[in-house]
């Protein structure tokens, strides 16, 4: 078996400080995209991350690449939270609840407009991250339904819409103020998901395919 030489490994494996810089850039970009939107200057992101402009461009050649990495990293963390919830052996609905609250903290809804307007939504990295999240959410919901704890007339799309709407500040309101109420309102919604259902919902359960269908 041929083993890579130290020189080869040095070329192919990023240094620890380079990885830390990349992580700092992604973290700063996520915070600033959430606070100020997609047009925040990259030099401002570099300043918050504590790195030079050249370091930002060395890691991300353009804004689209940085936005994509931010969205994928948020989805990856959301998936990791979902996998932890799936690994729980206790109450299935409580596991779903914990996952929903954790997902809201990621503030992915604030990034959705950037995904829709700045680059290809079908980029392989983005599709893979999105499919992983959707599969995990479906498994969590199916498990709660099988336990008789989640009403049967809701779909993955229903859950995703509400998490997105409740974790995005209403127009004209302060972002920080809204954060104080997100989990309160999410819990109100989650209580309405419990079986048995107390009312009949209009329409049919919303799927992810429904959300991707173009508006007429």
Give the location of each predicted region.
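Hydrophobic alpha-helical connector segments
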Residues: 69, 76, 80-109, 122-125, ...
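Helix-turn-helix/winged-helix DNA-binding modules
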Residues: 37-38, 58, 151
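C-terminal peripheral helix-coil segments that are non-catalytic and often amphipathic
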Residues: 1-9, 135-146, 172-216
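Amphipathic alpha-helical interaction segments
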Residues: 24, 44, 94-102, 158-162, ...
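Amphipathic alpha-helical packing segments from all-alpha helical-bundle domains
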Residues: 121-175, 180-184
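Basic, helix-initiating cap at the start of DNA-binding domains
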Residues: 1-48, 65
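Short linear capping/connector segments at secondary-structure termini
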Residues: 113-123, 204-207
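Short hydrophobic/aromatic patch on the recognition helix
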Residues: 50-60
């Amino acid at each position: 078996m041929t083993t890579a030489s130290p020189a080869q490994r040095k070329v192919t494996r990023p240094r620890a400080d380079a990885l830390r810089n990349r992580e700092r850039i992604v973290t700063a970009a996520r915070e600033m995209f959430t606070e100020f939107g997609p047009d925040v200057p990259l030099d401002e992101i570099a300043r918050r991350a504590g790195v030079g402009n050249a370091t930002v461009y060395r890691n991300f050649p353009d804004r689209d690449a940085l936005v994509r990495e931010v969205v994928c990293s948020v989805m990856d963390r959301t998936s990791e939270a979902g996998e932890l919830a799936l690994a729980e052996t206790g109450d299935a609905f409580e596991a779903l609840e914990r996952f929903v609250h954790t997902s809201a903290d990621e503030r992915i809804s604030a990034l959705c407009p950037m995904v829709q307007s700045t680059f290809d939504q079908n980029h392989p990295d983005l599709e893979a991250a999105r499919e992983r999240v959707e599969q995990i959410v479906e498994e969590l919901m199916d498990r709660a339904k099988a336990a008789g704890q989640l009403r049967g007339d809701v779909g993955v799309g229903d859950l995703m819409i509400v998490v997105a709407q409740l974790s995005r500040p209403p127009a004209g309101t302060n972002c920080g103020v809204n954060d104080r109420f997100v989990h309160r309102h999410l819990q109100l919604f989650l209580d309405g998901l419990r079986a048995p259902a107390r009312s009949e919902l209009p329409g049919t359960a919303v799927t992810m395919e429904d959300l991707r269908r173009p508006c007429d």
